[in-house]
């Protein structure tokens, strides 16, 4: 379905939990409060939303969190979404820690591909950033995803000045050894703006740093039709991608809505404009009526984000990564 600005909205990102087995500081601020179980949508409620979205042209679904693999019985949700007519891309974003335990079952259930969040290739720094995670588990997960052909495999890294910007050569070197797509993402000002100003690294600076050592050739979009701009590097097995939500936003081409774990339909990541889907579901709304609500929401999707608004507050764990 087209929104009011002629963008085709065919992609739903579904957060199934705000909980995570890691504690990355930019995702969860110190005062982060987890939701209680009753606040979270059940899998049947999530499936109701997906089914109601299908008549509007839904084609792509991504399961996120928190860390989605900490949600019990996630395979049930994956299997049921994969079985729906019209869904041609079902993806998962994970930190990779639990992925080896579930990878083969996820593949069998119908998962198309997987993205990994990884902000350091230094084991000690990885533990520091994540609050105790083990890098070797994530590297095992990446290898397993490639082995199972859950491709294209994408790795998402938030580059942070003073934290991991000095590892950029190591990240680029990785694509010479593995056929993965390593994407660098600008830090978004979701909670602590003062810290954000100190740590923010623009995509322009990232490209300048990499191109000083490597030849970057603008490449084609890699499966998923997301906002990344990709570059090929001669002799590399993979590619480099950059995502610039702030310095060069991609709102003109935005094709997605977000369903939070608590049942709020978020029309834009950076706006507090939401539709309380959970209350509608629990009041007995019919699927046809819910489709109508989704249609109206799509038509209210804003033209562009407002990361500069001083009243914007949020955390990625609550909103959904």
Curated annotation (Swiss-Prot):
Locate the residues binding S-adenosyl-L-methionine. Answer: 26, 66, 117, 188
Catalytic activity, reaction form: GTP + AH2 + S-adenosyl-L-methionine = (8S)-3',8-cyclo-7,8-dihydroguanosine 5'-triphosphate + 5'-deoxyadenosine + L-methionine + A + H(+)
- Give this protein's Gene Ontology molecular function annotations: 4 iron, 4 sulfur cluster binding; cyclic pyranopterin monophosphate synthase activity; GTP 3',8'-cyclase activity; GTP binding; metal ion binding; S-adenosyl-L-methionine binding
Chain residues that bind GTP: 13, 62, 93, 154, 256-258
Entry-linked PROSITE patterns: MOAA_NIFB_PQQE, RADICAL_SAM
- Identify the metabolic or biological route this protein is part of: Cofactor biosynthesis; molybdopterin biosynthesis
Q: Which cofactor does it need?
A: [4Fe-4S] cluster
As for what it does, the entry says:
Catalyzes the cyclization of GTP to (8S)-3',8-cyclo-7,8-dihydroguanosine 5'-triphosphate.
Please give the name of this protein: GTP 3',8-cyclase
């Amino acid at each position: 379905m087209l929104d009011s600005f002629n963008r085709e909205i065919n992609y739903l990102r579904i957060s199934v939990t705000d909980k995570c087995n890691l504690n990355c500081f930019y995702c969860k601020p110190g005062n982060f409060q987890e939701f209680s179980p009753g606040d979270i949508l059940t899998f049947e409620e999530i499936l109701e939303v997906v089914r109601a979205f299908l008549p509007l042209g839904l084609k792509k679904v991504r399961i996120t969190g928190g860390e989605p693999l900490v949600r019990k019985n996630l395979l049930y949700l994956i299997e049921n979404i994969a079985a729906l007519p019209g869904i041609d891309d079902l993806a998962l974003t994970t930190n990779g820690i639990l992925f080896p335990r579930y990878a083969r079952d996820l593949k069998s259930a119908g998962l198309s591909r997987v993205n990994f969040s990884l902000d350091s290739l230094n084991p000690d720094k990885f533990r520091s950033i994540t609050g105790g995670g083990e890098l070797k588990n994530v590297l095992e997960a990446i290898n397993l995803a490639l082995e199972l052909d859950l491709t294209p495999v994408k790795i998402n890294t938030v580059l942070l000045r003073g934290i991991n910007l000095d590892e950029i050569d190591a990240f680029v070197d990785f694509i010479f050894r593995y056929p993965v797509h390593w994407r660098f993402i600008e830090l978004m000002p979701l909670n602590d703006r003062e810290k954000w100003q100190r740590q923010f690294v623009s995509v322009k600076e990232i490209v300048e740093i990499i191109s000083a050592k490597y030849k970057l050739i603008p490449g084609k979009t890699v499966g998923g039709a997301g906002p990344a701009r990709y570059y090929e590097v001669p002799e590399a097995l993979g590619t480099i991608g950059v995502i610039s939500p702030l310095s060069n936003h991609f709102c003109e081409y935005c094709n997605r809505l977000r369903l939070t774990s608590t049942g709020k339909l978020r029309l834009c990541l950076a706006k507090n404009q939401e539709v309380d889907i959970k209350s509608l579901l629990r009041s007995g709304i019919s699927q046809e009526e819910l489709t109508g609500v989704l249609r109206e929401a799509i038509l209210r999707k804003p033209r562009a984000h407002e990361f500069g608004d001083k009243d914007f507050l949020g955390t990625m764990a609550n909103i959904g990564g």
